[in-house]
Amino acid sequence: TYNILNTSNINWGVYGNASFIKNKINELHPDLNGKMIDGTRVYEEGYSMYRMYLAEWAGVDPETGLALYWSKDTDGNLVKTSDYQVAQANHKVATDDLLPTVYGGFGTNVEAYGFDFSVQLAYQLGGKIYDSGYSRLMHGGTSSFAGNNWHKDIYKAWTPENTKTDVPRLNANDRYANSTSTRFIISSDYLSLNNITLGYTLPKTVLDRVGISRVRVYCTADNVALWTKRKGLDPRQSFTSATTARYTPIRTVSGGINVAF
């Protein structure tokens, strides 16, 4: 907290905080030989416990529009394949630490000539998240997703006229268009405007005439805005793995009058 200005009529202060996160697996059970894979998670000595273990996205085949994934041939060379099951069996990669490097908040408070104004923000930097909500909205039109909506990015899907794209073609027979992979790992950095409040306290000289000690009129807005890597992504749902299709806190605007006798 720091006071920028403090006079008889004006008081202006700012504040902020930052928390840094580090973690490392020091030792696993000897039978695990320093590493354990549990579905889409990997635990390895010397590394963060918050890492995912996924098939590696290789883009879109410009000739066919099929989703591609990195795999390995019999000689151990990296090759691209449209068969997700082959990629799953032969080549998966560990992500970097999903946890943010730093998170915290900051804001300001101003009081001047009876008015008071405050702004509160929060932030997160340096982390990653699996955007499962986005992945579900980028399906290829298979029957298992019948009735599901699409993200607007689906307009970028491969067509014979649009071959330079990272969005696979729309085809009801393509089971692997949005399979779990590094394709949907995205930055979890965010800046959120949590609160704005504006108030006015009536002068005491006015209130003394009616026997009231204090009256303050105010208006406040909560959950005002959120800025992230992708519109619609809310990394605040989880900082250890994936988004969970929860509703973002609703934006509210309210006002009131505080009266003290």
Model-derived regions, located:
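Membrane-embedded beta-strand positions in outer-membrane beta-barrel channels/transporters
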Residues: 1, 13-15, 105-107, 195-199, ...
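Conserved small-residue
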Residues: 3-98, 129, 138
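Transmembrane beta-strands of outer-membrane beta-barrel pores
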Residues: 4, 18-24, 112-114, 123-127, ...
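Repeated loop/turn-to-beta-strand initiation elements of outer-membrane beta-barrel proteins
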Residues: 8, 114-119, 205-206
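Residues that define the transmembrane beta-barrel architecture of outer-membrane proteins
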Residues: 10, 100-104, 189-194, 249-253
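Membrane-embedded beta-strand positions of outer-membrane beta-barrel proteins
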Residues: 14-16, 119, 217-219, 257
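C-terminal beta-signal and terminal closure region of outer-membrane beta-barrel proteins
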Residues: 39-65, 142, 149, 154-162, ...
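Extracytoplasmic gating/loop element in the C-terminal half of outer-membrane beta-barrel translocons
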Residues: 124-216
